[in-house]
From Swiss-Prot:
GO cellular component, one term: plasma membrane
Extracellular side: 1-36, 97-110, 174-202, 275-286
Residue ranges of the region described as Disordered: 331-354
Positions marked as site (Plays an important role in the conformation switch to the active conformation): E113
Subcellular location: Membrane; Cell projection, Cilium, Photoreceptor outer segment
Organism of origin: Bufo bufo (European toad)
Protein name: Rhodopsin
GO biological process, one term: G protein-coupled opsin signaling pathway
Length: 354
C-alpha cells in the first residue's frame, strides 16, 4: 500500500519516513505547501461569499413573491435550500480546516461534516433529476396532457430527501465511513480502502450505480428527448417565431445544464472511481482535492443556471433589491401581456427551463 491507513483516516503517503500524522491532530503540511492550503481557504471563502447570497436571495425572493410559489418552483426552492445547506454546514468547516492545515474538528466532526456535505450534494443532484423528469413529462407528453400539480411537487421534494438520506445515512450506521480526503481538510465517503469491517466496497459500488450513474442516465435521456421534441415542433411551425425562440432557449439551457453537470460531477466521480478501482496505487492529495472542489462549485452554478436565468424570478429579485420597484420597468402587467403574446402549441411555459 502506498498510503497510510489509520482508524478513521487514510493519508495518500507512505509512512516509511515517519512524517505522517493524524489529520485530526496535526497540520498536514507534508502533503502540500502551506500556501496551497491558503489558496484552498481563499477558494472556499469565495464560494461562501458568492453561494450564500445567491441561494439566500433565491429562498427570500420566492417567499416574498406569491406568484413564484408555483409547483415547479418547489423543486427549485429545494435545490436552493440544498445549496444553502452545503454552504453553511460544509463550506464553512472546510474553510476553517484549511486555515489550520488539518481537519481540526476531529473524527466526530468529520462524520458530521461528511454527512451534511453528502446530504446537501445529493439533494441538489436528485432535485436536478426531478426537474429533468418534470420537463420531459410536460413537454414530451408521454402521458397526454399531464399537469404538474402541487402534490406532484411535494412528492418530488420528498423523493429527493429520501434518495439523499439513503446515500448520506449508511456511513453513520456502519456501512462504509466518512474520512478526510485529498488535503485532509474536508470529509467524504471512503473511496480509498476496501475496509471489510464496514463493507466499504459494496457501499461504494451502490453509491456509484444508484447515486451517480442512474441520475446521469435519467438527465441525459430526459433532456435529449426534450430537445428532439422542441425541434420537431419548430419544424412543423416554421412561421411561428415563438416556437423558434423557444427552441433556441431550450437548446441553450440544455447545453448549459449538461456541460455544468459534467464539469461539477464527472471529474470527482471519475477520480474517486479510479482510486477505488486501483487500491494501493500511488497518487497525491491534489489529485483528489481539485475535482472535489469542482463539485463544490455546483452550489453557485445551480442557482445561476436554473433560477437566475428565469425572467420572472429575475424581475422579482430586482424588485426586491430595489425596495419594491423595478427600475427596468418590468412589471406584472407587462409580464402577463408577454405571456399571452407568446402562447403557442409549444408554449413558453412548457419549454422554458423553469
Amino acid at each position: 500500500m502506498n498510503g497510510t491507513e489509520g482508524p478513521n483516516f487514510y493519508i495518500p503517503m507512505s509512512n516509511k519516513t515517519g512524517v505522517v500524522r493524524s489529520p485530526f491532530e496535526y497540520p498536514q503540511y507534508y502533503l502540500a505547501e502551506p500556501w496551497q492550503y491558503s489558496i484552498l481557504c481563499a477558494y472556499m471563502f469565495l464560494l461562501i461569499l458568492l453561494g450564500f447570497p445567491i441561494n439566500f436571495m433565491t429562498l427570500y425572493v420566492t417567499i416574498q413573491h406569491k406568484k413564484l410559489r408555483t409547483p415547479l418552483n418547489y423543486i427549485l426552492l429545494n435545490l436552493a435550500f440544498a445549496n444553502h445547506f452545503m454552504v453553511l454546514c460544509g463550506f464553512t468547516v472546510t474553510m476553517y480546516s484549511s486555515m489550520n492545515g488539518y481537519f481540526i474538528l476531529g473524527a466526530t466532526g468529520c462524520y458530521v461534516e461528511g454527512f451534511f456535505a453528502t446530504l446537501g450534494g445529493e439533494i441538489a443532484l436528485w432535485s436536478l433529476v426531478v426537474l429533468a423528469i418534470e420537463r420531459y413529462v410536460v413537454v414530451c407528453k408521454p402521458m397526454s396532457n399531464f399537469r404538474f400539480s402541487e402534490n406532484h411537487a411535494v412528492m418530488g421534494v420528498a423523493f429527493t430527501w429520501i434518495m439523499a438520506l439513503s446515500c448520506a445515512v449508511p456511513p453513520l450506521l456502519g456501512w462504509s465511513r466518512y474520512i478526510p480526503e485529498g488535503m485532509q481538510c474536508s470529509c467524504g465517503v471512503d473511496y480509498y480502502t476496501l475496509k471489510p469491517e464496514v463493507n466499504n466496497e459494496s457501499f461504494v459500488i451502490y453509491m456509484f450505480v444508484v447515486h451517480f450513474t442512474i441520475p446521469l442516465i435519467i438527465i441525459f435521456f430526459c433532456y435529449g428527448r426534450l430537445v428532439c421534441t422542441v425541434k420537431e415542433a419548430a419544424a412543423q411551425q416554421q412561421e411561428s417565431a415563438t416556437t423558434q425562440k423557444a427552441e433556441k432557449e431550450v437548446t441553450r439551457m440544455v447545453i448549459i445544464m449538461v456541460v455544468f453537470f459534467l464539469i461539477c460531477w464527472v471529474p470527482y466521480a471519475s477520480v474517486a472511481f479510479f482510486i477505488f478501482s486501483n487500491q494501493g496505487s500511488e497518487f497525491g492529495p491534489i489529485f483528489m482535492t481539485v475535482p472535489a472542489f469542482f463539485a463544490k462549485s455546483s452550489s453557485i452554478y445551480n442557482p445561476v443556471i436554473y433560477i437566475m436565468l428565469n425572467k420572472q424570478f429575475r424581475n422579482c429579485m430586482i424588485t426586491t433589491l430595489c425596495c419594491g420597484k423595478n427600475p427596468f420597468g418590468e412589471d406584472d402587467a407587462s409580464s402577463a401581456a408577454t405571456s399571452k403574446t407568446e402562447a403557442s402549441s409549444v408554449s413558453s411555459s412548457q419549454v422554458s427551463p423553469a
